[in-house]
Amino acid sequence: MNERIIIFDTTLRDGEQSPGASLNVYEKLEIARQLAKLKVDVIEAGFPVSSPAQFEAVKRIADESEVIIAGLARAKEIDIKAVYNALRNAKKPRIHTFSSTSDIHILGKFGDSKYGASLEEKRKTILKMSYDSIAYAKTFCNDVEFSAEDAGRTDIGYLCDIIETAIEAGATTVNIPDTTGYTFPSEFGFKIAELKRRVRNIDKVIISVHCHNDLGLAVANSIIAIQNGARQVECTINGIGERAGNASLEEIVMALKVRNDICNYYTDIDITEIYNTSRMVSGFTGIVVQPNKAIVGENAFAHESGIHQDGMLKNKQTYEIMTPESVGVNKTKIILGRHSGRHGLKSRLGELGYHPSEEDMQKVYEAFLELADKKKEVFDDDLRVLMGDEIYKKEELYELQYLHVTAGTDTIPTATIKIRSNEKVIQESCTGDGPVDACFNAIERALEIRPTVESYNVRSVTSGRQALGEAIVRIRNGENSFTGRGTSTDIIEASAKAFLQAINQYLLFTKTNLEFHEDELIIRNV
């Protein structure tokens, strides 16, 4: 008989830790709604204690979601209380706490003698800290998950000890992360099997796994873990995450479905929503899906070889083990124009996973008409970009109101801008080493800020001569990096928008963190 696998999506927590993938509250809400439509079982919405923005995002998602919402916490009371406060209105809250367990992590993070003079003493300290944190979390929430950080490199004997301790303290899910993506499937499968064999009362909890992709083995390790007793997998849309990323949700789900002949497991995922979810996450994070990415890449269902094309024409199953339609790829292009009407636009946005309020819909419709005047034909990818732009505008401090650029072979590039903030309009002109540099210089002069530009990229996000171009700019100011995205049929305008958005992200970060104190998260809403 087939057994159900719980899908724990951590796109909004671990996935957002991808360099440059910062999401605002409204973007996180849209993604959470789409994840619910995808029918994931658990959404890990963030790390509430880390910042006011994280706290607010977790709270907003928890307030409206029907699925299990998890918040991450270190093995500290302040973290756990912050998660509780963020999730207190959730219909199905989960507190997710963790402790370091590998020798290299223990010696690196708990080197101080107050944790013990020897490795063995430090291990005992961590056992007690883990027990206490889980027991404390249980006073707020029945559903508590414990993660043994860097379990992939943790001695199996100590891993069994800490998992047994977690179960005794009341954990309902025990998570075994391959934090550094170090293990081979044979090793990881053995580890899960040993936990099943050696840990008392392991049958009373859910075994979860969280695999990173540093060696390209995250999905393989997740599958082998399932075959050895894991019943929850933690994963992200498009496999995004720190370093080389996490196990890809779409790859795990489709592997279990396509190979159900040898894997007697299933998920509740609505696979027809996979493609829309992938494109939404890519659009909001600015992380492009590689063309040859399994399941959701642009080339995933493309066949160029003559032999392959001939085989496909005769029988699609010759070279396709799943259909593009099964994962939500619409082969029939739906084209909208300025005569499509508000209802037609709203209907198509809903099909793509976007559900703007009536107030927001008016702004979206006006932006759609403006785009339709420029492009004549508006495709799904245009709508995804449009929604990303409109959701971002909810949090901007400064808006680009006007831009005029002169440039040419015998002309000094000059940019004139007008930036609006509330009722105030700032105008500046600057020259530069090219039109983009001139725009950046004018914005810097207007806002009296000069960050370091770490990276600047431009790409086409739709097709044809009138395609929308997207600029992605990453800036650094002090220790923090901020990413801005801008789109337009004019790449110079897109670049200016992206640079201004990155500065807006920095200014919002500075503003909220100046007002932030750890005590606020403990007492808020109590």
Regions found by a protein language model. Give the residues of each.
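Short, ordered loop/turn segments at secondary-structure junctions
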Residues: 12, 47-48, 74-75, 99-100, ...
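Short, highly charged C-terminal tails/helix-capping segments
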Residues: 512-526
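Non-catalytic terminal/interface segments that mediate subunit docking, oligomerization
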Residues: 17, 30-31, 376-482, 486-493
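A mid-to-C-terminal "edge-of-domain" accessory segment
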Residues: 4-5, 11, 254, 260-429, ...
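Alpha/beta enzyme core
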Residues: 3-7, 14-42, 55-64, 77-207, ...
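Catalytic alpha/beta core domains of metabolic enzymes, predominantly
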Residues: 183, 190-314
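Mixed-charge, glycine-accented linear interaction segment located at domain edges/termini
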Residues: 481-483, 487-516
